[in-house]
């Protein structure tokens, strides 16, 4: 899987990320990874479900990985949850 086939979800509206996922599949990608951390995890799940159910009927959720990442902040180390959702045809 190429690094181009990854959509990092942040604070933008859900439909911006859905458009990115649909564009990746329409350009020939067989799999697209949706990645998010922290508060954006619920938005990433929304992106996967909207992409799969409304726009791409033949796409399925192939894998879901959850993890914890350690970030160094000015207040010391902080643990942040992360998710990776793999959609594929």
Swiss-Prot record:
Gene3D superfamilies: Alba-like domain (3.30.110.20). It holds the Pfam family Alba. Keywords: Chromosome, Cytoplasm, DNA condensation, DNA-binding. The gene is albA. GO terms for biological process: chromosome condensation. This is DNA/RNA-binding protein Alba. It comes from the Archaea. One of its GO terms (cellular component) is chromosome.
């Amino acid at each position: 899987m190429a690094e181009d086939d990854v959509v990092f979800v942040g604070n933008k509206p859900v439909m911006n990320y859905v458009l990115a996922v649909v564009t990746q599949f329409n350009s020939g990608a067989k799999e697209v990874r949706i990645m998010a951390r922290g508060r954006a995890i619920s938005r990433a799940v929304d992106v996967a479900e909207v992409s799969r159910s409304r726009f791409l009927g033949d796409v399925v959720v192939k894998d879901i990985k959850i993890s914890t990442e350690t970030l160094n902040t000015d207040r010391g180390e902080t643990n942040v949850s992360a998710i990776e959702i793999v959609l594929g045809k």
